[in-house]
Design a protein with these regions (language model features):
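Nucleotide-activated sugar donor-binding and catalytic core shared by glycosyltransferases
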Residues: 1-238, 243-366
Length: 366
C-alpha cells in the first residue's frame, strides 16, 4: 500500500493549537500516511510553546519571524522559502488552517506548483473584506485554490456552496480547536494567578486584533475598568499579546488597577485551564469564540463582525463591538443578571464533539 504524504503548514499560535491534534492523529496511522510538519515561525515564541505542549517536532522550520515584520514580509518570505520545501518533499496534499498570512501564502505556493490544498476550518465568512483584516481576504483566497474543504459547521458549508464550491469536496467535521481542549484542560490544575483570583468572579480578557488598535482598544479597556469598579467581587487576568501597540494601550488604561493583572502570554495548556476557571470572557479573538462554549463560558466579543455566527445564534457569544458604552452595558448585564448569565453559559456548543481530526484523516484516507 502506497502511503499518502500529507504536509501541514502553519506558523502562528492559534494555527498550531488547531493543527497539532491533526498532526498527532495522522501519526497514529503510519501505515496510511507519511506526515510532514512545516512551520513558518510567523509567531516564534508563542508557536514553540504550543508545539511543546502537544509534543510536535517540525520537519521544516522556515524561521521567517523578524522584528517589525509586515504582511508583505510574511507573505513574500513564506512564498519563497516554502517553494524549496514543496519541491523537495513533493507532498500529495498540503493542509493549511484558517485565515493567517501563512495559510494564504502557503496555499498560493501550492497553487503555483499544482499541489492539492486541504483547507482546515474552511468557509468562515464575515462578508466584509476589511473585517477582520487581512484574515477575511486570506480565508477567501485559500478557498479559491483548495481541493478539500473541511468546514467546521453547516453554516460554513453553506457559505462555500453559496460561492459555487462543489458539495462533493466539502466535509463538515467540527472544529479541531475543540479536539485540543481534550488534551489541555485538566482536573486539579493550579496556577499562582488563579490562586490570587480565588473567591472572586474571574474575568479573562484577550485583546489584540489589528483592526482594534488605537482608539477602539482604549475604549474597550476603559469600559472594562468602569465595570470592574462597579463590581468589587470581580478580578481580571489579561494575558497580553506581544504587540507593543497593544501593550502601550493596556498599560495606559489599566495600570494601577489592583484587581486586574496584566501578565505575559500564557502557554496553551495554561490558557485553556484559565478559561475553564473563569466566570466569563471578553475577547476579540477568533478561536476563543469556539473554545469557550465547550467549557460553558459566556463570551462577549469586542468586534463589530464575527465569522462565527453559529455561536451568536446558539446564544454562547454576544457581539458587543468596540464602543465604550455598549461594552459597559453588556458586561454589566452579565455580571448583574443571573438569568442572562445562565442562558449564555448553558447554550449548546455548535463547534463539534472533539473528534474533528479523526474525521479529516478519514477523508484523506478515502
Amino acid at each position: 500500500m502506497t502511503k499518502k504524504k500529507v504536509m501541514l503548514v502553519f506558523g502562528t499560535r492559534p494555527e498550531a493549537i488547531k493543527m497539532c491534534p491533526l498532526v498527532n492523529e495522522l501519526k497514529t496511522r503510519t501505515d496510511e500516511f507519511e506526515t510532514v510538519v512545516t512551520v513558518t515561525g510567523q509567531h516564534r515564541e508563542m508557536l514553540d510553546q504550543v508545539l511543546r505542549v502537544f509534543g510536535v517536532t517540525p520537519d521544516h522550520d522556515l524561521a521567517i519571524m523578524k522584528p517589525g515584520q509586515t504582511l508583505f514580509d510574511v507573505t513574500c518570505d513564506v512564498l519563497l522559502k516554502l517553494k524549496a520545501v514543496l519541491e523537495d518533499e513533493r507532498p500529495d496534499v498540503v493542509l493549511v488552517h484558517g485565515d493567517t498570512s501563512t495559510s494564504f501564502a502557503a496555499a498560493l505556493a501550492c497553487f503555483y506548483l499544482q499541489v492539492p490544498v486541504g483547507h482546515v476550518e474552511a468557509g468562515l465568512r464575515t462578508h466584509d473584506i476589511y473585517s477582520p483584516w487581512p484574515e477575511e481576504f486570506n480565508r477567501q483566497a485559500v478557498d479559491i485554490v483548495s481541493e478539500y474543504y473541511f468546514a467546521p459547521t453547516e453554516a460554513s458549508k453553506q457559505n462555500l456552496l453559496n460561492e459555487g464550491k462543489p458539495e462533493s469536496k466539502i466535509w463538515v467535521t467540527g472544529n479541531t480547536g475543540i479536539d485540543a481542549l481534550r488534551t489541555t484542560v485538566r482536573e486539579g490544575y493550579s496556577h499562582p494567578e488563579l490562586e490570587w483570583a480565588e473567591g472572586s468572579r474571574l474575568i479573562l480578557i484577550t485583546a489584540h486584533r489589528r483592526e482594534n488598535l488605537g482608539e477602539p482598544m482604549h475604549r474597550m479597556f476603559r469600559a472594562i475598568r468602569r465595570v470592574m469598579v462597579d463590581h468589587p467581587d470581580t478580578k481580571a487576568i489579561y494575558p497580553i499579546h506581544m504587540n507593543p501597540l497593544v501593550r502601550k494601550a493596556a498599560h495606559e488604561e489599566l495600570d494601577g488597577f489592583e484587581r486586574l493583572h496584566i501578565i505575559d502570554p500564557l502557554e496553551v495548556l495554561d490558557f485553556h485551564n484559565f478559561m475553564a476557571a473563569s466566570h466569563l470572557i471578553l475577547t476579540d479573538s477568533g478561536g476563543i469564540q469556539e473554545e469557550a462554549p465547550s467549557l460553558g463560558k459566556p463570551v462577549l466579543v469586542m468586534r463589530d463582525t464575527t465569522e462565527r455566527p453559529e455561536g451568536v445564534a446558539a446564544g454562547t457569544l454576544k457581539l458587543v463591538g468596540t464602543e465604550e458604552d455598549v461594552i459597559y452595558r453588556e458586561f454589566s448585564r452579565l455580571l448583574s443578571d443571573q438569568t442572562e448569565y445562565e442562558a449564555m453559559s448553558h447554550a449548546s456548543n455548535p463547534y463539534g464533539d472533539g473528534h474533528a481530526s479523526e474525521q479529516i484523516v478519514d477523508v484523506l484516507a478515502g
